[in-house]
Curated annotation (Swiss-Prot):
Pfam families membership: CBFB_NFYA
Parts of the chain that traverse the membrane: none
Official protein name in the record: Nuclear transcription factor Y subunit A-2
Molecular function terms from GO: DNA binding; DNA-binding transcription factor activity
Short motif Subunit association domain (SAD), span: 139-165
Subcellular location(s) per record: Nucleus
Ranges of biased composition (kind: Basic residues): 178-189
Subunit structure: Heterotrimeric transcription factor composed of three components, NF-YA, NF-YB and NF-YC. NF-YB and NF-YC must interact and dimerize for NF-YA association and DNA binding. Component of a heat stress-inducible transcriptional complex with NF-YA and NF-YB subunits made, at least, of NFYA2, NFYB3 and DPB3-1 in cooperation with DREB2A.
Low complexity biased stretches: 216-233
Gene: NFYA2
Cited PROSITE patterns: NFYA_HAP2_2
DNA-binding span(s): 173-198
Residue ranges of the region described as Disordered: 178-244
Organism: Arabidopsis thaliana
UniProt KW keywords: Activator, DNA-binding, Nucleus, Transcription, Transcription regulation
Length: 295
């Protein structure tokens, strides 16, 4: 009977509450004893030494009885031989100190009683994204070596071109193309730095040149006055300075020279010339052919 009570005391159901898994401390037997009418005490009895009535139909040596009342009384809770009362789980005696209520997977050591802790953490270790392998030697196939080198060179060249484009975009050139820049340097500019319209200037210059050419052609096309005319023959006498004309006119040398100068230059504008009254009279006499003037 004593061995049976010991076995039942060792392998009885754990008396630990369900909230002990969340970190609460187990209650002491003194805290359970109190003047409370709604608290159910535990009374354990044994056959033989206690002298109480035992049901003949029950074959168990110990039984649990729940009753209301004062738990402090030692008569209601006798201590049998070989039976131990403890609020802790009997798993402590076997070496396990974990509560009966377990949590989920991240706390695997609590679920497996520390067995998994010997293997270390089971989480994945993320590798770095940029793994520098230039320092270490890389072994490749001999047939693929030249292709790998060629691709690496092309990638390096593309990266260099990209860097150059980035730098060129930062410092922009003042012109779009070098040929346009040279053409802009050759074009004439005005005082404000703007380009001059050379087409209109070329048209104006060609028009003035054409006008000048037409005037020279007109001057060249006009015949020069003849020195000797069949109708008006001139005879100059240097002694007396007089001139006899065939039509009966006698004019002094000074007047004749001035008249010849006037007649030899008909192209000049009349607005800038001042004709004396004597010259006008001589010209009228020559046209009429009936007067003789002497000075």
């Amino acid at each position: 009977m004593a061995m049976q009570t010991v076995r039942e005391g060792l392998f009885s159901a754990p008396q630990t509450s369900w909230w002990t898994a969340f970190g609460s401390q187990p209650l002491a037997p003194e805290s359970l004893a109190g003047d409370s009418d709604s608290f159910a005490g535990v009374k354990v009895g044994s056959v033989g030494e206690t002298g109480q009535r035992v049901d003949k139909q029950s074959n168990s040596a110990t039984h649990l009885a729940f009753s209301l009342g004062d738990v402090k009384s030692p008569r209601l809770v006798p201590k049998p031989h070989g039976a131990t009362f403890s609020m802790q789980s009997p798993c402590l005696e076997l070496g396990f100190s974990q509560p009966p209520i377990y949590t989920k997977y991240p706390y695997g050591e609590q679920q497996y009683y520390g067995v998994v802790s010997a293997y270390g953490s089971q989480s994945r270790v993320m590798l770095p994204l940029n793994m520098e392998t230039e320092d270490s030697t890389i072994y490749v196939n001999s047939k693929q070596y030249h292709g790998i080198i060629r691709r690496r060179q092309s990638r390096a060249k593309a990266a260099a071109v990209l860097d150059q484009k980035k730098l060129s975009s930062r410092c922009r050139k003042p012109y779009m193309h070098h040929s346009r820049h040279l053409h802009a340097l050759r074009r004439p500019r005005g005082s404000g730095g703007r380009f001059l319209n050379t087409k209109s200037q070329n048209l104006e210059n060609s028009g003035t040149n054409a006008k000048k050419g037409d005037g020279s052609m007109q001057i060249q096309s006009q015949p020069k006055p003849q020195q000797s005319n069949s109708q008006n023959s001139e005879v100059v006498h240097p002694e007396n300075g007089t001139m006899n004309l065939s039509n009966g006119l006698n004019v002094s040398g000074s007047e004749v020279t001035s008249m010849n100068y006037f007649l030899s230059s008909p192209v000049h504008s009349l607005g800038g010339m001042v004709m004396p009254s004597k010259w006008i009279a001589a010209a009228a006499a020559m046209d009429n052919g009936c007067c003789n003037f002497k000075t």
